[in-house]
A protein has these predicted regions:
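FNR/FR-type flavoprotein reductase catalytic core
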Residues: 1-120
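Local cysteine-cluster metal-coordination motifs and their immediate loop/turn environment
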Residues: 93, 117-142
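Short Fe-S-cluster ligation motifs
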Residues: 41, 128, 139, 144, ...
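Short amphipathic alpha-helical patches
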Residues: 69, 96, 125-126, 150-154
Length: 154
């Protein structure tokens, strides 16, 4: 369905260009169709810089993997799970199942970061659109460690 690549484009590019700052970088990006793929020039660079898995919901083109991004999380070769961090961005239902897969692999909630920016409207804490429980997504986030952010799912 949707894509969370826009909010993490900068961090992916940064670590792709500074490989000495990470031991290994895995990136899984999902798009609805090949026509919906964003940042094609970046993707060409990222293919050379990291382990990149690109998925689309369905396609006849053999280059693309098909299906949900969560299908490919168990394939990641994470050498030391306790020294690994994950950033999960996208539709809430995808984030829920992606986090579940990461937890099954042995990651701790504190190692997983989620983004809730889809909830924001004014960005100033005035309209209340982004308020979930006592948290204003626009003021307190939008990025949360999963141990804190798990209470912010609908």
């Amino acid at each position: 369905g949707g894509t969370g690549v826009s909010p993490v484009r900068g961090v992916i590019s940064y670590f792709g260009e500074h490989p000495d700052e990470v031991k290994k970088l895995h990136t899984i990006l999902g798009f609805k169709s090949p026509a919906d793929i964003l940042f094609r020039d970046d993707l060409k660079n990222w293919e050379q810089q990291m382990d990149l898995i690109l998925t689309v919901d369905s396609s006849d083109v053999p280059f693309y993997r098909t299906g949900l991004v969560t299908k490919y999380i168990p394939e990641l070769e994470l050498d030391n799970i306790h020294e690994t961090a994950a950033i999960v961005v996208g539709p809430p239902i995808m984030m829920k199942f992606a986090v579940a897969e990461l937890l099954k692999m042995g990651m701790q909630e504190e190692q997983i970061w989620i983004s809730q920016e889809r909830k924001m409207c004014c960005g100033l804490g005035k309209c209340g659109h982004c308020r979930m429980n006592d948290t204003y997504i626009c003021l307190d986030g939008p990025v949360f460690c999963y141990s804190e952010g798990k209470k912010l799912f609908d």
